């Protein structure tokens, strides 16, 4: 199994939210307390796609719904009718769902005409919600934005990464103190994908030559 897949967040509690308000809206939507359309926007690797799919799974955790039918990339929608949206919602409601739910990845890749059609569909059909992701909020039709709650995702700081990074290191047999882990991550800036690369490198350094890793750790952490 790929390292990134092995340590992919399994629940929303494993997602690192920079903004407490965003965390609240996300978790309340996943718990079926909110039913407004969402646009998760921000830079690549900020956790938007993981969050969108975990919201969807949270809404249907107790139901027998094929999650694979609930997520689509915008580029795939360019080659077919947006009827897939209401079709998926109806499929989900056939299993007893009050509201259908579909994740649309990179929704900004829809041409303007398709975005306007999408807006008309969500206006007409109130029995489902869409959860969209984008790296480019400015490319999304403003009236479509107005029908959604737009939540901004940004990169966590090293301090915010600390608990998750330490847990991953622990799982792989590298037991460091919080101070050591923080110093090990010193200087890191970047996305969740870059963090996974960083941690994988650290773990491979440890497993390939523990003595050299210990020396590296002493240099990097000052221990």
Per-segment meaning from a language model:
Residues 1-43, 87-94:
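Pre-Walker A (pre-P-loop) alpha-helix and adjacent loop at the N terminus of AAA/AAA+ ATPase modules
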Residues 90-91, 104-146:
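Conserved catalytic/switch belt of AAA+ P-loop NTPases
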Residues 73-75, 149-162:
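Conserved AAA+ ATPase "SRH/arginine-finger" region at the nucleotide-binding site
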Residues 20-23, 66-100:
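Short glycine-rich substrate-engagement loop in P-loop NTPases that contacts/grips substrate
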Residues 158, 162-182:
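Helix-loop-helix "sensor" segment of P-loop NTPases
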Residues 199, 203-223:
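Conserved C-terminal helix/linker of AAA+ ATPases
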Residues 30-71:
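Walker A/P-loop
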Residues 182-187, 193-207:
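C-terminal helical "lid" of AAA+/P-loop NTPase domains
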């Amino acid at each position: 199994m790929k390292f990134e897949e092995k340590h992919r967040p399994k629940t929303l509690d494993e997602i690192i939210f920079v903004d407490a308000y965003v965390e609240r809206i996300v978790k309340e939507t996943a718990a079926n307390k909110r039913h407004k359309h969402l646009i998760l926007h921000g830079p690549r690797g900020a956790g938007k796609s993981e969050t969108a799919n975990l919201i969807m799974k949270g809404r249907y955790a107790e139901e027998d719904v094929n999650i694979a039918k609930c997520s689509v990339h915008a580029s795939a929608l360019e080659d077919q009718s947006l009827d897939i949206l209401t079709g998926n919602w109806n499929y989900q409601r056939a299993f007893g769902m009050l509201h259908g739910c579909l994740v649309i990845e990179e929704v900004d890749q829809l041409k303007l005409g398709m975005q306007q059609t999408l807006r008309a569909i969500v206006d007409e059909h109130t029995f489902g919600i869409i959860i969209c992701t984008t790296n480019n909020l400015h490319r999304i039709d403003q009236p479509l934005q107005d029908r959604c709650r737009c939540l901004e995702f940004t990169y966590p700081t090293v301090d915010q990464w600390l608990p998750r990074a330490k847990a991953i290191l622990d799982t792989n047999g590298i037991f460091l103190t919080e101070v050591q882990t923080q110093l090990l991550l010193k200087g890191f800036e970047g996305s969740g994908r870059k963090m996974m690369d960083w941690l994988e490198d650290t773990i491979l350094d440890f497993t390939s030559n523990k003595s050299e890793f210990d020396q590296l750790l002493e240099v990097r952490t000052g221990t």
